[in-house]
Amino acid sequence: QALLNIAADSGIAHDEPKSREDWARLMQRVGVKGIHIAERDTQRSKNPKPADVFVNTWSVEGFVSEGLQPAELGWGTHETWMPSNGRRHETGCQAAIYLMQPGANTRVRSWCPTPGAQYGFLVTHNESISIADYFTVGEGRNPKYRPTCHYAYHPANDAVLSLHEMFGAAGVKQAANHILD
C-alpha cells in the first residue's frame, strides 16, 4: 500500500500491479532507492541487568547466533560503491552483500514511531534480502533495478547492555541467560 500511496502522491499513473514483476517495475518507476525496516523492542525489566548474564526478550541463543553472523543487507543497483569490508555471495539470488563484521556490532541510524530517531543494529533478517530480490527488475549480478534494503533492530535496553558486555569480552557470551517475563 505504501508504494501505491507514493505513486499516487507523486502523480505517477500506473496499472494495478498484479505480479512480482509489476510491483518491481512500479517501484523502479517511482524511484525508490532504499527500504528501511526498523524494529524497537521496548520491554523492560523491573530489576537491573546483573553482570555476566545475557538478558533478552526472546531466545538468547537465537539472538546471539543471529547477532554474531556477518551483517547482511539487500544491495541496490544505485549503490556505486562497496564497503571495504563488504563481500558478495558466490551463489544465490545476488540481491545481498554481507559485511565482515557481526551484525549486532554494526550500528545503523534508524527511526521508529514511538522513540523517534535511534540506533539499530544491522542484524541479518531474511526480509532484507527477499524484499530486495522481490523488487528486482532483471536477474543475476547486473539487474536493471534493485532497491537497497536493510533491517535495523534495537533490542530491549537490557539486551543492548548484554551485547556491549559480550562484545567487550571479544564476543564471548555471558555464562548465564535470562529471558524477561
Regions found by a protein language model. Give the residues of each.
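Rossmann-fold NAD(P)-binding glycine/threonine-rich loop
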Residues: 1-2
